Regions:
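Helix-turn-helix repeat elements of alpha-solenoid scaffolds
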Residues: 32-47, 77-83
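Generic alpha-helix detector with strongest preference for long hydrophobic helices that associate
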Residues: 25, 48-49, 56, 81, ...
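Flexible helix-coil transition and linker loops at the boundaries of alpha-helical arrays
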Residues: 45-60, 91-100
Length: 111
């Protein structure tokens, strides 16, 4: 799925978010400008807050998982391990799935 950053609509709708995959995030990172690479994180963050406010916890968990993946694999900012750990733990608090547990183990190995 092609990811677009839209300042007029700075979050993903639930159906769009659920259509995103970790590969989509990696492809976006490879093709985007440095600014848009960072902006994607903030769009995901805004989406997470919006979903939690609407009590859409399974989708919020998926968003937190995508954030952990993006921080740990693609973006790798300073403290990426700690930040990714925070978001994968949040995903697991909201919806404990085998996929999130597997990623927790990967993240816990460090980068």
């Amino acid at each position: 799925m092609k990811i677009m950053i839209d300042f007029g609509h700075p979050y993903f709708e639930e159906n769009v978010l659920l259509g995103l995959t970790p590969d989509d995030l990696s492809c976006f990172y490879a093709d985007a400008s440095e600014v848009d690479r960072l902006n994607l994180f903030f769009v995901l963050e805004a989406s997470l807050h919006r979903l939690q406010g609407k009590e859409r916890m399974k989708t919020a968990a998926y968003c937190a998982f995508l954030m952990a993946y993006y921080l740990f694999i693609a973006l790798t900012p300073p403290a990426s391990f700690e930040l990714a750990e925070f978001y994968i733990d949040r995903a697991l608090e909201l919806d404990e799935t085998p996929e999130y547990c597997q990623w927790k183990a990967i993240i816990d190995e460090g980068n």
